[in-house]
Amino acid sequence: MAKNITDVSRDDLSKVSDEELQKCSKEELLRRLRKVDAEKMNLMLEHGNMMKDVNRRLQLHLHEIRSLKEVNQKLQEDNQELRELCCFLDDDRQKGKKLSREWQRFGRYTASVMWKEVGVFQQKLKELESNQDSVMRENLELKEIIIMLDDERNGAGSRSSIDSQSSLSNLNGGSATVRDVGDGSSTSSTGSAGSPDHHHSHIHKPTEGKITSIRRSMDDLSTNHLLRNIPNGLNDSSSNYIRQLETKVRILEDDNKQLLSQQGSVGDLKTLRKGLSLYHSESQLSSLSQFQDTLQNGSIRIAGGDLAPTVTGYLPAAQKPEAVVHAMKVLEVHENLDRKIPEDYEEDLSEKEKAIVREMCNVVWRKLGDAAGTKPSIRQHLSGNQFKGPL
């Protein structure tokens, strides 16, 4: 029976009932008790070791947790700093983007303004170039006109007065006395003293409106005479302007002729010498050049048939050629310049203007002499009227 209890204790004492334990002896129970205590102590030691190991591991884990917390805290701080830095950089990026957009708008605006300014300046440059070209052309034309006028003035000044003297001496049959042209004086014969100007000495003075119209017509006639000498190298605008002036001159000449016919005689010009003395010469040039052109074309026919002088040595004014009538006017102007001018006329003509009128009269006589050399009818009129022009 004791063997059975021993076998049971070996397996498990907890499974042994109390009755069986009561049946065991004391020595067996003590032995089992000590054995159980020893096992218990071993278990407690193992448990303590295990607890120490667990505590040690727990401490290690705690240290790891603490270190991880510290690392996590540092990482959080770094993350916060990075966030702040990202926010700052994002603000800078937004500011830079906004600034870049503003600069782009400003650049587009400045570029458009610059393009507009460049276009305006290019247009102005083109206008300036065109104006420069027109000014250069006008300067060239003016240079040509000035050179032509200088050549004409030099040619007119270099002409010898002996040519006109010889031509007029031949016309008058050598009976006229020779006088110098340079003194600016002129002699009138008895024929001029008995000219139609003296037959109409009691004619009323024209009205102020007629004087103004004649003065304007004479100004245009003088302008026309200067424009006739302009060379053909000018542009179309200048030639059109010249043609318009010539048309205006022809209209004014017709009006002037009608006004002169209404006055009744050539002697009316004597009453206008105060206002028109400076314009007679250039009007004679224009009228005489037209008469010379018609003489060259052979289209002039003297009215009245015969050219024989009348008892007094003159033909009626309607039967005289236009050149002879104008020559009488020029001679009258030349004679009036040599006379003593009244006090109310002293301010009208200066010495320079008198010299210009004398020079124009000389030119008219020279042209008249050239025309008379080609047409015998003019020579007969000049010799019949016994004109003595400046020599």
From Swiss-Prot:
Chief location bin: other
Subcellular location: Cell junction, Tight junction; Cell junction, Adherens junction
Start and end residues of each stretch annotated as Disordered: 154-212
Amino acid composition bias (Low complexity), ranges on this chain: 158-175, 183-195
Keyword Coiled coil: yes
Disulfide bond entries: none
InterPro entries according to UniProt: CCDC85 (IPR019359)
Keyword Coiled coil belongs to the record: yes
Coiled coil: 23-87, 121-146
Keyword entries, A-Z: Cell junction, Coiled coil, Developmental protein, Tight junction
One Pfam short name: CCDC85
PANTHER family per UniProt: COILED-COIL DOMAIN-CONTAINING PROTEIN 85C, RE60986P
Family named by the database record: Belongs to the CCDC85 family.
Function text: May play a role in cell-cell adhesion and epithelium development through its interaction with proteins of the beta-catenin family. May play an important role in cortical development, especially in the maintenance of radial glia.
Protein name per the record: Coiled-coil domain-containing protein 85C-A
Gene from which the chain derives: ccdc85ca
